[in-house]
């Protein structure tokens, strides 16, 4: 029996962070299953394949001198409200609650089913900031469903916002992500261990500390460190690698 086709709107950050990666992969897979999927982001998410049937809907960041900066939350809310009507969306699913949950609630109130997925620092760090906590809590309380990527995060969301989150762990596609010796040889010599870190290099990711840990590993066995991503801690990580004498083995 053919499943019902849904018109789904997903909201995400487009960069290298985990929440954007999960959202882009989910959008692509849902679209390939036959649903009409629209991914809202300020630019095309880097993990959304060029050939994906999911459609990127750009969110503009208009700037007016009267404001201190671009009003992302309002722009996203306006884009969601306008495009949901035009596209006939059945549901909107946001990834990373701040400010996506509040923007979706501002756009629809309780007039359209909203699902919010919590990814980590949107609860533990950013979401606890007094500037964001109240609006985020109200948006989560009004949602049709809230999910979290781990039991620990669901428990933290309960303490922080008083919401019950369903645990839906991030998935791994074993057909795509499996040991490939020929790929490892692109980065490491025969007999070397290859360590990989992937993130958006924000301070909470502690990338310089990863380099420090790697320097200790290098003293005990041959290894290389592959850092995938970019962000504010990139230069500091490079500096630490040079200071500890492991820069030739850090890429």
Q: PLM ranges: what are they?
A:
Residues 1-6, 180-194, 220:
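Nucleotide-sugar donor-binding and catalytic loop/hinge architecture
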Residues 10-17, 23, 28-74, 231:
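N-terminal strand-loop element at the rim of the active site
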Residues 11, 147, 188-214, 226:
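Conserved donor-binding/catalytic core segment of Leloir-type glycosyltransferases
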Residues 43, 152, 171:
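Carbohydrate-associated surface elements
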Residues 73, 91-111, 118:
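An aromatic- and histidine-rich active-site surface loop
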Residues 89, 107, 112-130, 142-145:
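A short, histidine- and acid-enriched strand-loop-helix "catalytic/donor-clamping" loop
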Residues 126-127, 172-186:
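Acidic anion/phosphate-binding donor-loop and adjacent secondary structure
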Residues 235-251:
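Nucleotide-activated donor-binding/catalytic signature segment of Leloir-type glycosyltransferases, i.e.
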């Amino acid at each position: 029996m053919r499943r019902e086709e849904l018109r789904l709107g997903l909201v995400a950050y487009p960069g290298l962070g985990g929440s954007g990666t999960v959202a882009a992969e989910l959008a692509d897979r849902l679209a390939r299953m036959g649903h009409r999927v629209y991914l809202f982001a300020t630019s095309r998410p880097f993990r959304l394949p060029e050939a994906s049937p999911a459609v990127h809907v750009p969110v503009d960041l208009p700037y007016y001198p009267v404001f201190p900066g671009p009003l992302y939350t309002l722009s996203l809310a306006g884009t969601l409200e306008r495009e949901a009507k035009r596209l006939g969306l059945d549901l909107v699913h946001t990834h990373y609650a701040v400010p996506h949950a509040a923007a979706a609630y501002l756009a629809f109130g309780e007039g359209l089913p909203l699902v919010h997925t919590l990814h980590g620092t949107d609860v533990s760090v950013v979401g606890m900031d007094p500037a964001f906590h109240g609006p985020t809590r109200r948006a989560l309380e009004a949602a049709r469903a809230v999910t979290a990527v781990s039991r620990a995060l669901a428990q933290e969301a309960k303490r922080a916002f008083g919401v019950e989150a369903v645990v839906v762990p991030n998935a791994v596609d074993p057909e795509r992500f499996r040991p490939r010796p020929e790929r490892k040889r692109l980065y490491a010599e025969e007999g070397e261990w290859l360590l990989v870190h992937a993130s958006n290099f924000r301070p909470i990711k502690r990338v310089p500390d990863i380099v420090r840990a790697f320097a200790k590993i290098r003293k005990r066995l041959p290894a290389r460190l592959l850092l995938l991503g970019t962000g504010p801690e990139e230069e500091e990580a490079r500096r630490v690698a040079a200071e500890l004498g492991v820069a030739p083995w850090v890429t």
